[in-house]
A protein has these predicted regions:
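Jelly-roll (double-stranded beta-helix
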Residues: 1-171
């Protein structure tokens, strides 16, 4: 199991704030060139309004970690829940209204890639698919502690204690 703390995440600036890349597959993937299958990130949003970038050919998932985020899509206002990933297609025109300094969690998956994503709590997994576990609170995996907003990556059966977002896939 590989543990990555939030201080180790690759950080970049964007027009609306700061993004921390948590995971990308393949490892040499390139966000700007859209050359990746799966990318997991978290953004600190400094603007109170922002537009989502076009990711045609990808499916997106978003979860607010801190603050409030409301999506504007097809003339509708969609307040996001802190307990449920919201799914939308990367080619949809989506903007958001946020509390200043809101923090979100994002998963972007290329169409055709089989990825299981979800929020789990106190679960065991019996297969060896590659799994990225993002801790929504202090958690443990097979007894090893993982801090809030840190990540564990593993490819073996495991038991999780606590609440986390998972992305499970075959490489």
């Amino acid at each position: 199991m590989e543990i990555t703390t939030q201080e180790q995440y690759q950080t970049t600036m964007w027009k609306g704030g700061t993004t921390r890349q948590i995971f990308i597959s393949p490892a040499d993937g390139d966000l700007a060139a859209r050359r990746f299958d799966l990318r997991i990130s978290s953004a600190i949003i400094e603007l109170t309004e922002s537009d989502f970038s076009d990711f045609t050919g990808f499916t997106r998932y978003i979860l607010p970690l801190e603050g409030e985020i409301t999506l504007l899509k097809d003339g509708r206002r969609i307040p996001l829940s802190h307990n449920e990933l919201y799914r939308f297609e990367g080619d949809e025109a989506v903007s958001s209204e946020n509390t200043k300094g809101a923090i979100d969690f994002n998963i972007i998956v290329r169409h055709g890639i089989d990825v299981e994503v979800g929020i789990v709590q106190d679960e065991c997994f019996s297969d060896s698919r590659k799994t990225v576990v993002f801790a929504l609170e202090d958690i443990s995996i097979d007894g090893e502690l993982i801090g809030k907003h840190d990540t564990a990556t593993l490819a073996k059966p495991f038991c999780l204690k606590g609440k986390a977002v998972i992305a499970r896939f075959s490489e």
